[in-house]
Design a protein with these regions (language model features):
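Start (N-cap) of specific transmembrane helices in multi-pass transporter permeases
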Residues: 63-83, 161
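Final/C-terminal transmembrane alpha-helix of multipass membrane proteins
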Residues: 154, 162-178
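Hydrophobic positions within alpha-helical transmembrane segments of bacterial inner-membrane proteins
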Residues: 30, 34-35, 43, 75, ...
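Short cytoplasmic-facing helical segments at TM-TM junctions of multi-pass membrane proteins
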Residues: 43-69, 151-154
Length: 185
């Protein structure tokens, strides 16, 4: 569409900024919320149904420290790494699309990308990842701990976990965008 206005030179700028600042981290967080968030809720919830959480308390272990904290730490490390992979895949895919539709060669794409973005653009998206990971882990764990004694309860809480985590991740992404605009980042 930019070709009609003679703005194909800005395709790389737009793709670079949009992918690195917003889309890659947001889509990665949504996928992690759906996959890992639901798994955390299901696992903790099934342990709650089988009274394994109560057994941990009886033997003197803190269920939060044993079950929740390790998952939270793993997500805080994994989501930024997955975001880096997502950034690279998004830019590689964008390069191929720009080449096929606009005739921008991959070498020209990379050259324009270097001119269009700097490290602050890259870090603007990467900074969000640990916060989103904490949200996903906390929401999933809280929903898992709320599970009652039935499979129906487990299913409801797994669904609620994914929906709540995705909603809060999108809200936090919007808050980051407003914060970045306020500090001119």
């Amino acid at each position: 569409q930019l070709q009609r206005f003679g703005a194909t030179a800005f395709v790389v700028d737009l793709i670079g900024v949009l992918s690195l600042r917003e889309l890659a981290v947001l889509l990665t967080a949504i996928m992690v919320a759906g996959r890992s968030g639901s798994a955390f809720t299901a696992e903790i919830g099934s342990m709650k149904m089988r009274e394994e959480i109560d057994a941990l308390k009886v033997i003197g272990l803190n269920p939060i420290g044993v079950l929740v904290f390790p998952r939270l730490v793993a997500l805080v490390f994994a989501l930024p790494l997955l975001t880096v992979v997502s950034d690279l895949v998004a830019l590689a895919g964008a390069s191929m699309v720009a080449w096929s539709y606009s005739g921008i060669s991959p070498a020209a794409f990379v050259g324009r990308l270097r001119d269009a973005i700097d490290m602050s653009t890259y870090f603007a998206g990467l900074i969000k990842a640990p916060f989103m990971a904490m949200i996903i882990g906390i929401v999933a764990s809280v929903e898992g701990m709320k599970v009652g004694g039935s499979a129906e309860s487990l299913g409801r809480h797994v669904t609620a976990s994914v929906v709540k985590a995705i909603f809060v991740v999108i809200v936090v992404d919007g808050l980051f965008a407003m914060f970045y605009a306020a500090i001119d980042f």
